[in-house]
Amino acid sequence: HFVRYGLVPKREQRPGVDAAELGTLYHEAAERFTHAVTALPEFPEVSVEVCDKLMDEAVSPLIDAWRESPMGESRRGEAVARRIRRTAKRTARNIVSQYADSSFRPMQMEFVFGQNGLSPIVLELGNGTFVYLQGRIDRVDVMTGGGLRVIDYKSGSRKFDPTLVYWGLQLQLLLYLAAALARVPGSHAAGFFYCR
């Protein structure tokens, strides 16, 4: 209590690119882009040029805000900003491709569970203890017939590894899918994916 409220520690600001900050930027850009692109009458048949334009409109204000930081003003910051823009445009094309190649349509961005009065995922451990999980799923898509898929945006290189799932070391996507299924009556599992 004393440390948290008396000393009020803050994270040290070190020069360099903060991966968590960039991850948040990518998430926000992907969410803004998805809202914009799915509102188009021609969606999901959207050209690369339109994808790039919409993502540029989504990511530019975020990059501008980031560039106001000491890191963003440096030469390295300029290079990082160019990389952010390139990666964001690639992500935009991937998002549209996911919809164009399937019968899925977006159901909800930032799908919350275990917060704001919504039920958490409840797990009972072997010793009888309960664990209550809460979270926020980047995107949930639905297809005709009630199939749900969850999408988690990743800016890093993480890939799905069934061996890690088997050993209980990579359960995030499975838990997200369980949370979505619990909140949507009559739905069934249709998949879970990382999107870069």
Predicted regions and their residues:
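Short, well-ordered loop/turn and helix-capping segments at boundaries between secondary-structure elements
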Residues: R4-V8, E31-H35, A39, G156-K159, ...
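Non-catalytic protein-protein interaction segments used by genome-maintenance enzymes to assemble
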Residues: M107-L181
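Substrate-binding beta-hairpin/strand module that engages nucleic acids
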Residues: E42-V46, V50, F111-G114, L177-R196
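Secondary-structure transition/capping motifs at alpha-helix termini
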Residues: A36, L40, S97-S103, G128, ...
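Secondary-structure capping and boundary motifs in well-ordered enzyme cores
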Residues: D18-L25, S47-V59, R76, V80-T87, ...
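Active-site-adjacent bridging/hinge elements
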Residues: H1-L7, E57-D64, D141-S155
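C-terminal, charged and often intrinsically disordered regions of DNA end-processing helicases
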Residues: H1-A36, F130
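A non-catalytic, helix-rich entry segment at domain boundaries
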Residues: A29-S119
